[in-house]
């Protein structure tokens, strides 16, 4: 995994939330810092994500929002208005999709407030042809009760053609 400090915000947020992640085998790859990660099960807790941390994880906020829905406590995401002008309006879509799956999510002008809680349930969702939305909610669907269907889910091929194959391998 790339661990460049300008792009490692997801790793920092995971640790803030209580994730048990060890960084191993640090090295240079294509002139960038990289490492292997050892991730072990841990209960996650809510946190505040804002300010200078946002640019280091702007593309990972959809999956962080999914994590927050399963975490204990409240997660507040602020200063993320840039998500409104990505491949889709990711802020609105994330709120809508999490709510459709039963999460307690309140939109704000520049982010959202997510109250983690009971297990989510399956839902019919639209990728909006946004690969990060499709991948994030595929993960949410796996961790939820019932079936989740994502339309145009093959949009993940733009960035991660083997995503579904790799995700399925984690189920076993």
Give a label for each model feature:
Residues 1-172:
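Short, structured segments at the rim of ligand-binding sites
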């Amino acid at each position: 995994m790339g661990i460049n400090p300008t792009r490692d915000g997801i790793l920092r947020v995971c640790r803030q939330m209580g994730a048990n992640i060890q960084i191993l085998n640090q090295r240079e790859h294509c002139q960038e810092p990289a490492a292997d990660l050892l991730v072990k099960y841990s209960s996650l807790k809510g946190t505040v994500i804002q300010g200078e941390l946002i640019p280091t994880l702007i593309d990972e906020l959809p999956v962080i929002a999914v994590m927050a829905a399963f975490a204990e406590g409240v997660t507040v995401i602020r200063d993320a208005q840039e998500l409104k002008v990505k491949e889709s309006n990711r802020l609105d879509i994330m709120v809508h999709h999490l709510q459709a799956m039963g999460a307690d999510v309140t939109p704000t002008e520049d982010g959202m407030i997510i109250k983690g809680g009971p297990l989510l349930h399956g839902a019919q969702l639209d990728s909006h042809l946004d690969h990060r939305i499709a991948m994030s909610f595929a993960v949410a669907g796996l961790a939820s009760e019932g079936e989740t269907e994502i339309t145009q889910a093959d949009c993940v091929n733009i960035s991660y053609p083997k995503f579904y194959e790799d995700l399925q391998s984690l189920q076993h």
